[in-house]
Amino acid sequence: MSANAPDRPLILIADDDPDILELVAFRLERAGYEIVRAADGEEALQLVSERLPDLAVLDVMMPKLTGYEITEQLRADESTKRIPVILLTARVQEADVARGFESGADDYIKKPFSPGELQLRVQAILDRA
């Protein structure tokens, strides 16, 4: 876990769809996580540079930088390479899933998704971190 309070892990959520961004944030905040939000890829990386999250939930298709590109940049940097990443996407082809894992993602969730399942996956990854 990062330097954040151990009882409130910090989760970065990045999605250009405000409804999904708020749905995910609401669910994870209710579960006790501290949340930071980004509406595009550049904003997501800026937030990471300001405060390392314990986990990132990234939409694949966003303006400026995709979730794949953000994940690759996180993995290439010594200070961020261990941040767990969950990708969210409507892209469901096997090649898209493969691209997600090749970029360094820890999990890949297809939209539409269950907020409860996402919460369980976040918890499972953080429990192993």
Label each region the model flagged.
Residues 113-122:
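C-terminal output helix
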Residues 22-30:
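Charged docking surfaces used in two-component/phosphorelay signaling
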Residues 62:
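Receiver (REC) domain active-site loop signature in two-component systems and cognate sites
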Residues 38-42, 97, 115:
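Conserved Asp/Asn-Gly motif in the active-site loop of CheY-like receiver
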Residues 37-55:
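Acidic, metal-coordinating helix/loop segments flanking the phosphotransfer/catalytic sites
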